[in-house]
Amino acid sequence: MFERLYGCTMHSINWQPCFVFHLSIFALRLLLRRSIFESIVVSYLLYVSLGGWRYQRIFILTFLRDLMGLRCILMVQLNVLWLQWTKRTFSDMFEYTVKKRGPENVAIYFEDQVWTFGQLDAYSNKVANYLAKCGFKRGDILLLFMNSCPAYIGIWLGATKVGVATGLVNTNLCKGSLMNCIKTLSARGIVVGSSLKETFETVNEYNDLSLEMIWLVDEKRSLPETAYSNSTSSTCSWNIALAQVPHCAPIPLPRIANLREHLIYVYTSGTTGLPKAAIITKLRYTLLVVGAKYSFGIRQSDIIYDPLPLYHSAGGICGVGQMLLYGNTIVIRSKFSASQFWSDCVKYKCTVAQYIGEICRYLLCQPVRPTDKQHHVRIAFGNGLRPQIWKAFQERFNVKQIGEFYGATESNTNIANMDNKFGAVGYVSKIIDGFYPCYIIKIDVDTKEPIRDPITGLCILCEPNEPGHLVARIGSNDPFRMFDGYVNSEASEKKIIRNVLRKGDLWFASGDLMCCDELGYMYFIDRLGDTFRWHGENVSTSEVERVLDQAIGTLTGTVFGVSIPGTEGKAGMAAIALEGSKLTSIEEENLLCRINEEFTGNLPSYARPLFIRLCQNLTMTGTFKISKAEISRLGFDPNIDPNDHVYFLNPKTKVYQLVDQQLFNDINNGVFIL
């Protein structure tokens, strides 16, 4: 009862101030038999003198902010209720958008192509009819391995029209990682972009991928005019096949009251191991799109610049979803270009732009151009913008609002910076503590395990500005609290913490070190566990270590992330223990060449360690595990231990180069574009 009324548990540390205030009024009236007015005055003075002034200050400073958040939550709730009541499919929602916006209006700008809503609808109808002809049915899975283009959106949109879920494969993957992603979902078929043909064939040639159907699509020749025609200028199998099917709408799917039906799968690096397939349901997709719209005030008239890869949730859901569900025009690119970013925004008259932290740094590194301030972008939203460049980005490019948000693809932890608060990734209300149950708990930095109360066995909440592990309560009946997790149930289980605030409760473990100030603003500090983030991608250290082991044989090695001044995230670094062996310069060079070959052949560019430290020994824990905390403190400084040799992967020569004092200074001073 208490939790339902006040949004927190009886034993939680922070009782609601409003509850205490009302209780004091009741007590005074009962004991002193005073009038209600006198009781209120005395209670208020008592309340303020006992520390209530702090709550009053918080209330005054955050009331309007929290109203914005409440409005956003209410709009999301209304959309969820509407979905539950109407039982609409995702294709129903898009059809409504087409009718509302008009089939002749522009949906997508892509290089020299212009796709209208009608053309996108017709193309997706062709996809749906062809998949149905091939025997695909509701619940089947299709994989997409292609670069961003309008056909990419049309294919997975068409798949949803016949109830087929689509797995969006990271185009940077190769060999083992790519093979794992393909096998994870037990898909019936895959559509491969012509530009990625060779990468796919290296995996398909030597492995049984158990795929019934494989198509090659020509992204450049999947033109808007082919949406209605029966001809094609491409020789690729997918383009030819679509030319032979009609563009009429497929037979509508039966409407079912299942908001958790799988819509797409987004591959993401978890805390350990290979990339995992995160489940994106119709409900989850809607929550992310609606949440972004109302968090940052995106209008239907806005033209959104979305240069992010469409296999990412930021680009493929938060950006593309505004077009599919609300009729916004979007601008996409096959590859991000820092030099063309603002030129594109000017050309297409964009008013909203998306970013990840790396993008903002790349833009600041560009020469000053007139287009820097000739655009009409009023909102830039995304995640990962460092506080160190936040103000510089806003001032140079005259962007009035930064919409920073936080939330992993698979998580139920989604917060947003709605009021342009410098450096914050979002906030939770302190007026109604527990209304949106995201907390920061104390954690053992070495073991990464929660610190628990020795008496109750429950977790301990952090004080304001104290770093800790961000967790969010899981609830099966609350759309905001649902955790769909991964296709692999064991991987999902690893993201759950039990007995946090009460016995038997379930909480999502974000894997991120955060802190929260007294007003409820949250700030990202670092990643926990065996991952680090580089170039906007999560890198699994265990995956890199497996590749490293193939190169170093019986030697012991480990991988971790290190910070480089002036860059976002952490760059990869490998440490290898020679264990008493003394290598000649030629032997050392050969070892580095083998490592470089393995990294280049088996890892995407963002996962390849920039640094290698050759040392005599690695510190072990009491359980005979490598102490990454100890070795990571050394960073890539060659002076800390003169017996170690530190190497840097030179981005120009693509070989590992010995780090001396001059090279160390150059790296720290930003001489290299990393």
Predicted region positions:
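Conserved structural elements of the adenylate-forming
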Residues: 121-126, 259, 278-299, 307, ...
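Conserved pre-ATP/AMP-binding loop-to-beta segment of ANL
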Residues: 104, 215-216, 234-236, 243-267, ...
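Conserved C-terminal "lid"/linker of ANL adenylate-forming enzymes
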Residues: 558-563, 573-575, 594-674
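Gly/Ser/Thr-rich phosphate-binding loop
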Residues: 325, 347-356, 364-445, 482, ...
